[in-house]
């Protein structure tokens, strides 16, 4: 799936995975899974979440397609589950000056999982990050479904980057917003 401009300055740069057959070795993935990552660009650029590390080169290609050779200033980590975070170390190698943004629990987990300390920005409930033309705010939603989970809100664009809070399994097949996704397959599960 190619990158998609959601709104001016906001791009979906995630990746579809049609090869993984089970999530956490338990749940079947007959329709694949998407690893959702987003770029928010003002004067500075933030990447929100990453992808599973074996798809890191595709993420890098998507990023470059969206922003060319501009650097990413911030990596916002909403959720530490490896399908969201396991490309962090690779991104740090590509963008050595990137600052990793997360709450206290997230930053502890990044150090524990990936050995990365330093070059971080700790955020608390309601803190903001000004990208120059776009402002992100951070809101904690612990235990949805890990203890460090947070969401990121871009108020000027009225856009919520929700991590797993409203997620579902399945590759996106070109649809990013709910009006673009075929929902018939989900009705039985919702009942």
Locate predicted features.
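Short, conserved acidic/polar surface loops in the N-terminal third of protein domains
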Residues: 59-60, 85-90, 111-114, 149-150, ...
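Short, flexible loop segments at the rims of nucleotide/cofactor-binding pockets, characterized by
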Residues: 23-28, 51-53, 77-79, 136-142
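Short, structured coil segments at secondary-structure junctions
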Residues: 94-96, 116-117, 155
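Active-site metal-binding motif and surrounding structural segment of the metallo-beta-lactamase
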Residues: 43, 54-101
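Active-site environment of divalent metal-dependent phosphoester hydrolases
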Residues: 80-85, 107-110, 145-146, 167-170
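Conserved beta-strand hairpin/beta-sheet module of binuclear metal-dependent hydrolase folds
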Residues: 3-65, 151-154, 158-162
